[in-house]
Amino acid sequence: MTTNKPSFSYFKVLVLGQLPRFTLNYFGTDFTDNYVESIDDEFRKTLKFGQLPLFVDSDGFRLTQTDAICKYIAAKHDFLGKSIKERAIVDETIAAVHDDVIIPGYKVGKGVEDKKVIDTIISRHFTTFENVLAENKFIAGGDNYTLADLYVFVAYHYYKHLGHSEKFQNKFPHLEALQAHFESNKGIAEYIKNRPDSGRGI
């Protein structure tokens, strides 16, 4: 049976596309990364819910929804935690990062959300992540990194990209160490270096 390289499709903006792209690149996946300008009617008909992102595996398996894609990729690499409790915390972290950090940050960057939201998120979510790392070393506990750590890193990286670096200054040493760990990964370093600029800052 002929197989093709996996492919991932999303726009140039980071937002929800960055999480699967970071995950794929972290594991050194050889995949075709499609930066989509717009979704025409024909393309939309091929999408399960009429929207991106879209991941197509080498065997033709198609998957949409950011978190489902990331968990599918992570599962292939035993990156979802070893115990039921770790996996539950991974799910908890994924939901918090996606719904309470990435989306509001994007909305502020787009100008449709009050900037005061950023201070609340930093004091509530990033402080919580910092405290967890100070106590446990890894977000989900356990003895190794999981998708929860990668999600927290992406959120931290994204907020710096959005221009909030000075709000983090000297406050989150464990998050800084987490960022250094993931950005030392060859695949992630190459992705950050070579990804196109959306021109929109988000």
Curated annotation (Swiss-Prot):
Catalytic activity: RX + glutathione = an S-substituted glutathione + a halide anion + H(+)
Keyword Acetylation assigned: yes
One Gene Ontology cellular component: phagocytic vesicle
Top-level taxon in the UniProt lineage: Eukaryota
Signal peptide limits: none
Binding site for glutathione: Y10, R44, Q51, L52, Q65, T66
UniProt enzyme class: transferase
Modified positions (N-acetylthreonine) in chain numbering: T2
Record keywords, A-Z: Acetylation, Transferase
Disulphide bond pairs: none
GST C-terminal domain segment(s): 83-200
This enzyme's EC code(s): 2.5.1.18
Family to which the UniProt record says this protein belongs: Belongs to the GST superfamily. Alpha family.
PANTHER family the UniProt entry points to: GLUTATHIONE S-TRANSFERASE (PTHR11571), GLUTATHIONE S-TRANSFERASE ALPHA-1-RELATED (PTHR11571:SF164)
Official protein name in the record: Putative glutathione S-transferase alpha-1
